[in-house]
Amino acid sequence: MTQDPDVLDTWFSSALWAMSPLGWGNNGKLSELYNESDMEDFYPNSLLITGFDIMFFWVARMMMMGEHFNKGQLPFKDIYMHALVRDETGAKMSKSKGNVIDPLDMVEEHSADIIRFTLAYLAVQGRDIKLGAKNLDQFRNFTNKLYNATNYLQLNVDTFKDLGEIEVKTPLGRYMQSRLAVAVEEIRETLETYKFNESARILYNFVWNEFCDWGIEYSKADRESIAELGAIFKETLKMVSPFMPFISDHLYHKLSGTTLEEGDSLMVMNFPKEIKRDLEAENMFALIEEAITALRRAKVIIDMGNSKIDKAYIKLDSQIDTEMAKPFIQKLAKVIEIEFVDAKVENSITDVSDNLEVYLPTAEIDMQPIITKLTRQKEKLEKEIQKLNGMLNNERFVANAPEAVIAENKQALEDAENKIAKVSAELSSFNA
């Protein structure tokens, strides 16, 4: 057997890729495609992004060639190994299976921004991406949230200044700016360490849960803060830009009252930097949120979860500006009158949380239908517990049933016991 002398490694040219596009080894040929200083300016580069499946074929060979031909200087400082994109079941995409998703079709149906954000959010280190319509729909809803926030802000104020151009004075503005500071710090850190999925998750949580679900709802009790919230949202869009460049540019200029042709793209603006936190405002609104959540829970007990009630009492474990807090609690908890007290209120529905207690007076509420409903729930749970105990105490059942079935029944018993304890406590609070 004789080795063929006319064989070139398939990956040989790829191994030179870190240098050859910069003019290395071309001996002056095709000089119109590169500048004389390209090799000096761009070698070594800062980052290579690639799939882990070609690490040996391509990445390792580039490192060896780069080191060999450039006096020991490696071609990249960092290498980011991204996941492989699979179908929604986790199977590798292939034409023979018919499960290939054409990116152009996806862009047409969902938009490039939604696809970018979805892939970033799902790019968990060490795990392949399972991509399907369900994922894309989730992040379509996120873009709807961005549009809805913009529309709400402009229902109240036509245009907004940038955050650096205003002084944030309202309590709500100070609070949301402080929460933005936390998001900025965390997103900068995760981007710098290539944890793009964490960056996307933090951004998603801030926009959806903090700014929209709480900040915008709070602003309905404090219209003066909306101009500040608009500036904070514009700063947020700068963090959205790397993931969703088209939507973020559009909404930023819409809020500014400008067009992209008249101003700069977010892509060339400075990414948000360190913002000073306001812990006093954060602590204040943490208690306000806790009070609202506790009142909502208490209202569910009396079947008035989404209805407005006349009065509620709140007993705090710490001191806050109660007059400032009242409008937010009244608006979001749907309570006409709030009274802060120092002692427990008798004859009331009580909800106890970490830092406060809330009381709903029962004097004007017909409690009998509620007591009847809870009593029936208790009776049903008692029968369920009796049935599960009977099965789990049956030696024959335990010996023959699969372990998964036994574990499922044990969990069901634990859940039923927790529920009956809660129902019994509620009945006791009614002296029933």
Write out the residue ranges for each language-model feature.
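Short, contiguous acidic/charged loop-to-helix segments that flank catalytic cores in large enzymes
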Residues: 38-39, 46-54, 106, 221-227, ...
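Short hydrophobic alpha-helical segments that form membrane-spanning helices or hydrophobic packing faces
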Residues: 20-22, 97, 116-120, 248-255, ...
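A glycine-rich phosphate-binding loop feature that marks nucleotide/adenosyl-phosphate handling sites
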Residues: 78-85, 123, 132-139, 162-170, ...
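Acidic/polar loop patches that form or flank catalytic/metal-binding clefts of enzymes
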Residues: 3, 72-78, 115, 129-130, ...
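Acidic, turn-prone loop/beta-hairpin segments
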Residues: 87, 120, 160-188, 213-293
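Structured secondary-structure scaffolds
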Residues: 1-158, 176-221, 227-240
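Feature representing long, continuous alpha-helical segments
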Residues: 19, 57, 116-117, 209, ...
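C-terminal low-complexity, glycine/proline- and small-hydrophobic-enriched intrinsically disordered tails
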Residues: 137, 255-432
